[in-house]
């Protein structure tokens, strides 16, 4: 039986390096130790919240597995390895271990583009979209995302009685995902056990169709979490509202929507 003595978080760890880990200048926070280098990229609070291994407690392989799972959910973390080393015995003769949680940083930002063409019975069109992501916007592995999309399609044939001779769409969405359960008055232990993420988002969409012109505004507050070691996934929409406005429309269009 082994009890945990010191727990070190080693940021910017290089798996190919063979040098010994220098812990002489490690910082401390809530009885944990941090080897951060010159530019720490993630808050100490976030690291401690996702660690199930605690100083002074009995070694548990389940705590190790839960810690791996928790750090695997942090999108700014590319690589995690947990290493243990014997640390002798304390004054009561109890065997002790030191723990090293070795982390490597992933790329914080990404941009993706999409382009597509359409042909609907001879009516040609195209759509273009772009997505930007920052995986560590507040240095707690929060993911900020911004999406824009535009589409256009020409229309042919008899357009009498319609208000638009084309189909156009322009929309955007911004959101932030926190890798923890955010709600007032919750204990840290409960948040840690939930393995949940919290999503906030707002969106705006403008559409021109032959029968109407429509503007949609929306906002959402959602929770996502897993149970039974990730076998079950759950979604809960605490808030999901949409406001629809039709500045122009043909007669009778509302009855057909």
Per-segment meaning from a language model:
Residues 35-42, 52, 110, 162-257:
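Transmembrane beta-strand segments of outer-membrane beta-barrel domains in Gram-negative
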Residues 11-13, 105-107, 117-119, 132-136, ...:
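Beta-strand elements of well-folded, non-transmembrane domains
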Residues 48, 66, 94-98, 110-112, ...:
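Transmembrane beta-barrel architecture of outer membranes
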Residues 58-73, 81-84, 88, 148-186:
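Amphipathic, soluble alpha/beta structural segments
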